[in-house]
């Protein structure tokens, strides 16, 4: 090793300027060494801290690998191999953590500690001796200054002797401190070289020992394991690349569709509508009432499940029941100036929820699907075929054609028009020969009229002359007796749904078939507006009265009513057949279908009682017996129903507003 610079101890006593200049160089070197040593210690402490952190990190990593098994992943299929592999790696991490802990201890003992000792012992010693040398030099300078001021008079010899002794003591002290200081500075030149090498030797030995033990511990046992894990990862990568290619192809195919897939209601004129659905899914807007007059619309996901309409909000795990669709009715409605709205009503006719579809196609398919489900055809062996046949029949009801397919089976509705408490009647199949075919009841292609009963304003505009002409062709009050002279007066709130010509009035099946065709036509053609009227049943006539003007819109003689019946499932539907003479001498038959606010069987009961009154009016005794069997009002009129006030809501003048929505 090259020789180092040294301070000459022989020159310490003389303390010449040259010696002082050389001393300042050594002091500057010691100061630089002190700064560097502090920075070196910080770097080595950082390495030691990182190694300690590595110990803690590997320990935490080992625990986290074991925690994978306890995560209960929702999609945990095929994780068995991953779990076993992670368990093995956790064991490896524990062993590796032991090596890291040992390395951290070695770094602390052989790298960090020597630097700390060098700084605290050698550098601190030099700094202390520097301070002592400075104090001794100051004392020597003061004593020399005092000695230099001694006077020349002989009488001060004693003082001179004392000052001389003081100078000698100060000079001896300075000489001793300078010798110690010079020796420490000379020794520092050697110690700094060793102090720089020792920590690095300790660091290198620690790392070598760490890697050597690690190689001995893992080289043999880990080779086979790492090879198998590598093969497994590579196979997963191959599967991933293959799946990614498939997804890219699928993505390109899905994105290559036309713009119509993204644009709602792009084909408004001629949408491709499937009317044979027995299940349906999709987003709809649900109307919710938030106050007396305020509403909100919420977009939710709806789907049918058997005979139930289910709703599942976004983010929910499962759907909930919204409404039972069995025997319900669905019809388009005009709601808050929104398009594509429809309402689902309960089997009793009570209005239910209102929904909005996003397009005409979705709107009509939802209506058709709910109609199909409400008929419970999903319970049959081949519901798709039944749905196709039913919808073909519904289309034939409103489409002029020349031939019909024969019905495969018919249904018979049992009724008792005098029993107002009759409940829900099940559909019972009968022999096909005992029930008339559809062609025997209603001619194929018979048109259906939906606007025979005109609104009051239009009726008044057409009849501002001296005589009013009824839209049905009937004359006004001149031809019929006043209701005040009738023994029977019963009023019901009804809405006209449609009318059509029929071929026979020998069975109530013709009314049921007309109801089916009218409702099917309304659903297919999205006709939802109806005109509300008051149906006044007397012992002579049936009157349809405008609730706003109290003007009769139509009037039929009770004797011309040959059949009347209420629907056995939707109890608010009622219809009757009218026989009207023609100018040619023949008679025509027409069926009129209404929806009532009360049960249709009550209207049938009133009509039946009116016809009985007509029959017994010629026989005073029979009339008296009939009057005794029926409760009467104070003025002698018949009281038909206990809840008459509830059905009619009071006098006819109390009802205003001709338009309603079915």
From Swiss-Prot:
CDD domains: BAR-PH_APPL (cd13247), BAR_APPL2 (cd07632), PTB_APPL (cd13158). It is a peripheral membrane protein. GO terms for biological process: adiponectin-activated signaling pathway; cellular response to hepatocyte growth factor stimulus; cold acclimation; diet induced thermogenesis; glucose homeostasis; negative regulation of cellular response to insulin stimulus; negative regulation of cytokine production involved in inflammatory response; negative regulation of D-glucose import. Induction: Increases with aging and decreases by short-term exercise training in aging skeletal muscle. Residues 643-662 are annotated as: Disordered. The keyword Membrane applies. Residues 3-268 form the BAR domain. The keyword NAD does not apply. Residues 486-635 form the PID domain. Disulfide bonds: none annotated. Pfam families: BAR_3 (PF16746), PH (PF00169), PID (PF00640). Keywords: Cell cycle, Cell membrane, Cell projection, Cytoplasm, Cytoplasmic vesicle, Endosome, Membrane, Nucleus. Residues 653-662 have a biased composition (Basic and acidic residues). GO terms for cellular component: cytoplasm; cytoplasmic vesicle; early endosome membrane; early phagosome; early phagosome membrane; endosome; endosome membrane; macropinosome. Residues 277-375 form the PH domain. InterPro entries: AH/BAR_dom_sf, BAR_APPL2, BAR_dom, DP13A/B, PH-like_dom_sf, PH_domain, PH_DP13A/B, PTB/PI_dom. GO terms for molecular function: identical protein binding; phosphatidylinositol binding; phosphatidylserine binding; protein homodimerization activity; protein-containing complex binding. It is found in: Early endosome membrane; Nucleus; Cell membrane; Endosome membrane. Homodimer. Homotetramer. Binds RAB5A/Rab5 through an N-terminal domain. This interaction is essential for its recruitment to endosomal membranes as well as its role in cell proliferation. Binds subunits of the NuRD/MeCP1 complex. Interacts with FSHR; interaction is independent of follicle stimulating hormone stimulation. Interacts with APPL1; the interaction is decreased by adiponectin in a time-dependent manner. The BAR domain is necessary and sufficient for mediating homotypic and heterotypic interactions; associates with cytoplasmic membrane structures; mediates interaction with TBC1D1 and ADIPOR1. The PH and PID domains mediate phosphoinositide binding. The PID domain mediates phosphatidylserine binding and allows localization to cytosolic membrane structures and nucleus. The PH domain allows localization to the plasma membrane, cytosolic vesicles and distinct nuclear and perinuclear structures and is sufficient for RUVBL2 interaction. Multifunctional adapter protein that binds to various membrane receptors, nuclear factors and signaling proteins to regulate many processes, such as cell proliferation, immune response, endosomal trafficking and cell metabolism. Regulates signaling pathway leading to cell proliferation through interaction with RAB5A and subunits of the NuRD/MeCP1 complex. Plays a role in immune response by modulating phagocytosis, inflammatory and innate immune responses. This is DCC-interacting protein 13-beta. It comes from Rattus norvegicus.
């Amino acid at each position: 090793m090259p020789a180092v610079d040294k301070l000459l101890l022989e020159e310490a006593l003389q303390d010449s300027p040259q010696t002082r200049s050389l001393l300042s160089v050594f002091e500057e070197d010691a100061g630089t060494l002190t700064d560097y040593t502090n920075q070196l210690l910080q770097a080595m402490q950082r390495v030691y801290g990182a190694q300690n952190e590595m110990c803690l990190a590997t320990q935490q990593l080992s625990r986290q690998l074991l925690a994978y098994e306890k995560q209960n992943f929702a999609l945990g299929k095929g994780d068995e191999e991953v779990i076993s592999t992670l368990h093995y790696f956790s064991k490896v991490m524990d062993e590796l953590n032991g090596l890291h802990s040992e390395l951290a201890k070695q770094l602390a003992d052989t790298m960090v500690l020597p630097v700390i000792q060098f700084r605290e012992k050698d550098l601190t010693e030099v700094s202390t001796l520097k301070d002592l040398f400075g104090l001794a030099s100051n004392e020597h300078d003061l004593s020399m200054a005092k000695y230099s001021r001694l006077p020349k008079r002989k009488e001060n010899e004693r003082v001179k002797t004392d000052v001389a002794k003081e100078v000698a003591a100060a000079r001896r002290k300075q000489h001793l401190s300078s010798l110690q200081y010079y020796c420490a500075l000379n020794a520092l030149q050697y110690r700094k070289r060793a102090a720089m090498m020792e920590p690095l030797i300790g660091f290198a030995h620690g790392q070598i020992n760490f890697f050597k033990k690690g190689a001995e511990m893992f080289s043999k046992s880990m080779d086979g394991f790492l090879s198998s894990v590598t093969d497994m990862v590579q196979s997963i990568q191959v599967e991933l690349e293959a799946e990614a290619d498939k997804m890219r192809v699928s993505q390109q195919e899905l994105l290559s569709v036309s713009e119509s897939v993204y644009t709602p209601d792009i084909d408004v004129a001629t949408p491709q509508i499937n009317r044979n659905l027995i299940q349906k899914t999709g987003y709809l807007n649900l109307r919710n009432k938030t106050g007396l007059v305020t509403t909100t619309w919420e977009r939710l996901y709806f789907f049918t499940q058997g005979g139930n309409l289910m709703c599942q909000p976004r983010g929910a795990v499962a759907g909930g029941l919204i409404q039972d669709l069995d025997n319900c009715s669905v019809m388009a409605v005009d709601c808050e100036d929104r398009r594509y709205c429809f309402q689902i009503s309960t089997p009793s006719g009570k209005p239910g929820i209102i929904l909005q579809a996003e397009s005409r196609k979705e709107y009509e398919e939802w209506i058709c699907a709910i109609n199909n489900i409400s008929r419970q055809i999903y319970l049959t062996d081949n519901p798709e075929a039944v749905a196709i046949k039913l919808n073909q029949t519904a289309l034939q009801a409103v489409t002029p054609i020349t031939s019909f397919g024969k019905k495969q089976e018919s249904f018979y509705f049992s009724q008792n028009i005098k029993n107002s408490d009759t409940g829900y009647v099940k559909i019972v199949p009968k022999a096909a020969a005992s029930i008339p075919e559809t062609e025997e009841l209603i001619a194929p292609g018979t048109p259906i009229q939906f606007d025979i009963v005109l609104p009051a304003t239009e009726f008044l505009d057409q009849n501002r002359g001296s005589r009013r002409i009824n839209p049905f062709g009937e004359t006004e009050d001149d031809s019929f007796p006043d209701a005040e002279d009738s023994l029977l007066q019963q009023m019901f709130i009804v809405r006209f749904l449609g009318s059509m010509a029929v071929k026979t009035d020998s069975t109530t099946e013709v009314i049921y078939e007309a109801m089916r065709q009218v409702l099917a036509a309304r659903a297919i053609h999205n006709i939802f507006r109806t005109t509300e009227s008051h149906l006044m049943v007397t012992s002579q006539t049936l009157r349809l009265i405008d609730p706003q003007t109290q003007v009769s819109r139509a009037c039929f003689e009770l004797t011309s009513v040959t059949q009347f019946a209420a629907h056995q499932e939707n109890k608010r539907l009622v219809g009757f057949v009218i026989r009207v003479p023609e100018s040619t001498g023949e008679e025509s038959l027409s069926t009129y279908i209404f929806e009532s606010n009360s049960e249709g069987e009550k209207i049938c009961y009133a009509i039946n009682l009116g016809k009985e009154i007509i029959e017994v009016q010629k026989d005073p005794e029979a009339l008296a017996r009939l009057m005794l069997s029926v409760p009467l009002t104070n003025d002698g009129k018949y009281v038909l129903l206990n809840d008459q006030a509830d059905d009619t809501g009071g006098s006819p003048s109390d009802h205003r507003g001709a338009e309603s929505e079915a």
